[in-house]
Amino acid sequence: MTSAWSNEIQHEGLKQWIQEVAELVTPEDIRVCNGSDSEYAEVYSIMQKSGVAIPLNSDLHPNCFLVRSSPEDVARVEKFTFICTAKKEEAGPTNNWRDPQEMRQELQGLFRGCMRGRTLYVVPFCMGPLNSPFSLIGVELTDSPYVVCSMKIMTRMGAEVLKSLGTSGTFHKCLHSVGVPLSPGEKDVAWPCNPEHMRIVHFQDDSSVMSFGSGYGGNALLGKKCVALRLASYIARSKNWLAEHMLIIGVTNPEGQKKYFAASFPSACGKTNLAMLKPKIPGWKIECIGDDIAWIRPGSDGRLYAVNPEYGFFGVAPGTSEKTNPNALATCRSNSIFTNVALTPDGDVWWEGLTSQPPAGLIDWRGNPWQPGGTPAAHPNSRFTTPLQQCPVLDSQWNSSEGVPLEAIIFGGRRSDTIPLVYEALSWQHGVTIGASMSSATTAAIVGEQGKLRHDPFAMLPFCGYNMALYFDHWLSFASNASLKLPKIYGVNWFRKDKDGNFIWPGFSENLRVLEWIFRRTNGEESIAKRTPIGYLPEESSLNLEGLNLSSQALQDLLAVDVPGWLKEVADVREYCKIFGSDLPQIISDELFRIERELK
């Protein structure tokens, strides 16, 4: 192994770590990534030669390729995702905890020799704008070319980051391997992975990540969920900021007044659709800062400011269409990676929901000829990885080092009953209780059962890097700082169904009508809302429903306070919160009691 790579690195601590890792994992070669387009093309051609990357029709999707993963490696694996803290209580009841010393020993065993016959890529990345006080720098060491190409799209990656790191800057150590060493002369498989031994491990003592056995998205692109949420949420608590699973949008009304909102939904509940919403109501404009992660800090003026630490979108493909999200389709037209979607005979991509009828002659996500009526042609959690800057409705402040001031925070989930279309929290404490009470029908973004209701507080259940009860407490602490001008908090639910099981609300671009009401509320319009035990609900006449074919009964159903339903909801949340024991903040118990008392 030559040491030519070490000449490219001025940071002694980084050099030493790479050397230590190389001695453990014994790669054939080491390559420091510079993030250039030519490097991307070269690494992509390696993937093409190995058979994992299929170039798409360059007239339809220039500089795009399709990747098929192993059927055993298609989503985040929560049961193999661990948080290591000195004490189990620090990780809390919602995380898989392991003792850091024991886990390090176990991982040493797994990583020993795991990159034999492969290249170790050094991937320096920055979450957040370079040189922003918000940002965190990481270095991912990986043996996956797919990770290298994806990290170029999803993060600010390469030589600029190394330059910013200097000779002594702080960085997060992120070690990743697909976990499949190659013997001399052994032919590689298209998508190497090691499902028996998958581990995605977060060490909070030194803010590092080690991931083994999976090459898929959130398990392997360690800047995303691992650093930007699981590590960052832990860091944020001690430094008085928030790392959240939220989209960020700019909303401009016909008068030209602009406000920024953040919104939190569990995976596959429409974050990307809302982040890129195309308004049908004349004069309104929605612009996107991010669709998945928000880092939020108090600014010098007391308002909360948000940045998107990411540089790309990693969107769920199925259901994305010209009707549901034309801006997403425009974004991933070029320079994008498609994973586990179907392939058409003319070299284009397809997935369920893209068109009403599937084209003939599809090859499915497993690489087999596909016939309608059987299993889906595209995997339900198939993805597009695409640059942020290609979004046609990208907000001008997308790269602001200070972030944008939030005027509303929105919590939502996939609920067929009880939860109304929109309601406003009576206070910050009530708003935190709304976030803590979130539950949603599960989707394909996680391995396991789909369609059952699971509690997902703040949509952070899989991503909070410490005890969630202490996380609630951290949110509540913002109210005790009198100098802060906190945003209003809202609950929304696009997914209410009628007795025949049909969605009552049309959703998608029509969700702007709800954002319009929220916008007016943040302007202090009192007469458009009425106080109820569960929050301020819209007066029926205050929602702009012009051009919508919505019956008065449907509107009543969407805005009703279902007393028996809510009493059951409160009881259910209270039961769930028992897992936190005495760590649960008293304020949340008090809010639940208040809602119950007022309902009765």
Curated annotation (Swiss-Prot):
Binding site for substrate: R76, Y216, G217, G218, S267, N381, S382, R383
Cofactor(s) recorded in Swiss-Prot or TrEMBL: Mn(2+)
Protein name: Phosphoenolpyruvate carboxykinase [GTP]
Purpose of the protein: Catalyzes the conversion of oxaloacetate (OAA) to phosphoenolpyruvate (PEP), the rate-limiting step in the metabolic pathway that produces glucose from lactate and other precursors derived from the citric acid cycle.
Assembly, per entry: Monomer.
Compartments reported by the entry: Cytoplasm
Active-site feature positions: C269
PROSITE patterns reported for this sequence: PEPCK_GTP (PS00505)
Cofactor comment text: Binds 1 Mn(2+) ion per subunit.
Catalyzed chemical reaction(s): oxaloacetate + GTP = phosphoenolpyruvate + GDP + CO2
The EC number(s) this enzyme carries: 4.1.1.32
Native species: Chlamydia felis (strain Fe/C-56) (Chlamydophila felis)
Gene3D superfamilies: 3.90.228.20, Phosphoenolpyruvate Carboxykinase, domain 1, Phosphoenolpyruvate Carboxykinase, domain 2
Ligand binding (GTP): A268, C269, G270, K271, T272, N273, R383, R414, F508, S509, E510, N511
